[in-house]
Amino acid sequence: MTPIEWLDDLGVLTERTIVGHGIFLDDHPWTHWHSPGADLRRLAEHGATVAHCPTVFARRGIALHHFGRYVQAGINMGIGTDVYPHNMLDEMRLVSYLARVVAENPRDTRATDVFHAATVGGARALGRTDIGRLEPGCKADFVLVDCAHPAMRPCRDPVQSLIYSAGDRAVRQVFVGGREIVRDGRALTIDYASAAAALEEAQGRALAQIRQLDWAGRGPDAIAPPTFPGL
C-alpha cells in the first residue's frame, strides 16, 4: 500500500488535502510499487493538491516526476519554498526547468501552468476565493514589476521575462492586502540591521553547540565543508 493509497483508505484524501512535495508516488522511477499510475489518479479524483517545493529536494538530487505530468493528470498544483532562500520567483523558474529536464521535453511545462500554480493553485489549496487573483472583492495582493529593467528586455512576454530572466531584480513594489510592504526592492516592515545582527548571534550559538548535538561529535566544517577550506 502506497502512502497515497493509505490516505485514501483512511478517508482523508479530499479536496482539502495538501500533499507536501508528493514526489515518491507509485510511478516515480525510484519506487517500485505494484500499481504504477494509481496514485496520480487518486489525487486527481479526490481534488487533492500537491505543494511542489523543488529547491529543497533538488539540492539532494531529487526531482518530481514531473510537474507537467501532474498538471495533465488534473491535479491541482501549488508552489512553495520550504527552504532558504524563500524566493517564489526562483522556485517558479526551477519548477519549469526541472520539469522540462525530467520530461525531456522543453514544451511539456508552460509558463502559464507555473504562474497558475503559484497564484490560483495555491489559493484553491487553501480553499480561498479571495486571493490568488485580481478581481473585485479579492485581497489586493500584487507586485509591480519594472518592465524597463534590463533583465526584462525585450519584454514581448512580461510573465516569461519575469520567471525566466529577471526574477526579483525587477520587482519594485509589493502590496499585501492593499498595504505596501516593499518599495524600490526593499522591505518596509523589517529592520535589516537588527535582523542581521540577531541572525549572526543565533548562528554563533548554533555553531558552538554542534559537537555536543551531533551524533558523531563532528564539528561544523565536517558536517558542512566550506567551499575553500583554510580560507
Name what the model sees in each region.
Residues 9-16, 49, 65-152, 163-167:
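His/Asp/Glu-enriched, well-ordered alpha-helical/loop segment
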Residues 22-23, 100, 148, 179:
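Flexible loop residues that form catalytic
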Residues 27-29, 59-61, 86-89, 152-154:
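Short acidic/glycine-rich loop or secondary-structure boundary segments that cap or lie
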Residues 33, 61-64, 89, 156, ...:
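Conserved strand-to-helix beginnings and helix N-cap segments that scaffold or border functional pockets
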